[in-house]
Amino acid sequence: MHEMSLAEGILKIALEYAEENEGQKVEEIGLIIGEMSGVVIDSLEFGFKMLAKGTIAEGAKLKVKEVPLRGRCTKCGEEMHVEHYDFWCPKCGDGVLEIVSGREMQVEYLEVE
């Protein structure tokens, strides 16, 4: 379950940020997670909740912005949402796509009091 190690990293970032800014409470953490990252959001939230107990991040909300998997055909330039990991271009039929988005996994913002 890599979600637990991700939750651990998110918590570390939040606590370090709060300490650097003399924060007393982490209220909200904004995350950007791509469709292709393989992250199970419910598992990530559960792991974070367990790890944050007893810290200033206990009760903090995780606000997740999910980014769709998008590709661009290297032959014709068509950009599309890639569904079910089907990497064939619907316009020209070529099978070589450049990933445009969907692999993101980052902390976008932190709200600390």
Residue ranges and their predicted role:
Residues 1-59:
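Long, charged N-terminal interaction/targeting segments
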Residues 71, 87, 105:
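Cys/His-enriched microdomains
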Residues 91-113:
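Short microdomains enriched in Cys/His and/or Lys/Arg
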Residues 67-68, 83-84, 102:
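Flanking scaffold residues of small Cys/His-coordinated metal-binding clusters
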Residues 32-36, 65-69, 110:
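Short loop/turn motifs enriched for small/polar and acidic residues
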Residues 79-80, 96:
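Cys/His-rich microdomains that often coordinate metals
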Residues 59-69, 90-91:
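Short, conserved loop-to-beta-strand elements that form functional interface hotspots
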Residues 73-76, 89-92:
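Short cysteine-rich clusters marking metal-coordination/redox-active sites
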